[in-house]
Amino acid sequence: MSAESWLSGRYELQNLIGRGGMADVWKARDHRLGRDVAVKKLRTDLASDDTFQARFQREAQSAARLNHPNIAAVYDTGETKDPATGLPVPFIVMELIDGHTLRDVLRDGRKILPRRALEFTQGVLDALSYSHACLLYTSDA
């Protein structure tokens, strides 16, 4: 494995599992604890922008305060150097949730029964309500 596929000498990036406007998400192996994790890494083209660096850091801190069964847990954060530019690139290590997204299910044309749709919706609403209450509480403290 190349040095670029390792973060902090601990996390081995395996495959890209998602892309967003600000970051890429990788399936990785935590060799210290012997478990698979998700690593969200700020896109290298945004790493030189202090605003994006700060936003990414705030996201990590906010997410780390949350402890809910419907929200991926944050395990660690860190920084790696972009080999091309030498710039620091932050990353967040999170719980890996295996499975399919709702988008995948719908794209495959599978039907979701109303009861199952209600379960999905209730899970999302529970997580949103919890995170909203936690973030309001911590910003008032």
Each predicted region: which residue ranges?
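Conserved short submotifs of the Hanks-type protein kinase catalytic core
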Residues: 85-101, 105
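Activation segment signature within eukaryotic-like protein kinase domains
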Residues: 120-121
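Activation-segment/catalytic-loop signature of the eukaryotic protein kinase fold
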Residues: 77
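Conserved N-lobe loop of protein kinases adjacent to the ATP-binding glycine-rich P-loop
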Residues: 29-36
